[in-house]
Amino acid sequence: MAGSHPYFNQPDSTHPSPPSAPPSLRWYQRCQPSDATSGLLVALLGGGLPAGFVGPLSRMAYQASNLPSLELLIWRCLFHLPIALLLKLRGDPLLGTPDIRSRAFFCALLNILSIGCAYSAVQVVPAGNAATVRKGSSTVCSAVLTLCLESQGLSGYDWCGLLGCILGLIIIVGPGLWTLQEGTTGVYTALGYVEAFLGGLALSLRLLVYRSLHFPPCLPTVAFLSGLVGLLGSVPGLFVLQAPVLPSDLLSWSCVGAVGILALVSFTCVGYAVTKAHPALVCAVLHSEVVVALILQYYMLHETVAPSDIVAAGVVLGSIAIITAQNLSCERTGRVEE
């Protein structure tokens, strides 16, 4: 009998259990970022950081060639059209399947409205302030709309991070509100802040509508429709409301090209992130755009950055750290038997 063999009856001390895996390997196998964490990291690195360059570069193009906001929107939409080739190669319909086509068009329309408001706002208010108002309003609206429409709540740490982002918004925008008493300039400043707020509201609605689209080529379809809808709406408006202006120098052309590429990268990363994490958390992490915009506002546009702006940037970064730390989770691949 195998159980009576001397080999099996030896004391346990002479035959210890096999050595465990190296600690580093076990940690790597046991701890993996959750889907929410992966989405937030993509939103931070691929969505917020590239988007922080868009506002200052748009301002530079406007200052160099007086490039109207509608024309800048047209150039940006042109970068979305080549996605049609990808859809054709995959054999997917350009306008989406019939059951989701109306929602996909509505999502694209909201995206264009959000971009248009952002471009208009950045021409009359500082780039960092415009980005802060837009991202702050999108964060608040996303939290409220998701809670009301999807009944998807947030943890206490998440709410703490959201409130920190809103505090950063108030610190940045608060001093600028005093300019509303300076006649015509104050009126334009107020309109710029209103446009930035409406841009954030449209962004939050777009993210919620996008989350409701469930079909494989969702992201490239919405990206192509955004370019198509933007061109159909902007080209007639450009000739009616503004005079077309071609970029006059290499700097303007470089800014236009960089805006188109960076904006498309940001759009793609945000579209991926919002399917993995709560829309309000994605919008909060996108506040990293504000920090980048403030840095570029000082070094590239040579615009004054107030001490309150620096404090607000620190508050925003701290809030993003809280949200990210809360969503960092370790998924165990196995349990240790006692």
Swiss-Prot record:
Family matches, as InterPro entries: EamA_dom
Mode of membrane association: Multi-pass membrane protein
Segments forming domain EamA: 49-174, 272-325
Region (Disordered) location: 1-24
Tissue: Expressed in testis.
SUPFAM superfamilies: Multidrug resistance efflux transporter EmrE (SSF103481)
Top-level taxon in the UniProt lineage: Eukaryota
Segments crossing the lipid bilayer: 37-57, 67-87, 105-125, 160-180, 185-205, 221-241, 250-270, 281-301, 305-325
Family statement: Belongs to the SLC35G solute transporter family.
Misc. remarks from the entry: The gene encoding this protein appears to have arisen by SVA-mediated retrotransposition of the SLC35G6 gene in the primate lineage.
Protein name: Solute carrier family 35 member G3
Record lineage: Eukaryota, Metazoa, Chordata, Craniata, Vertebrata
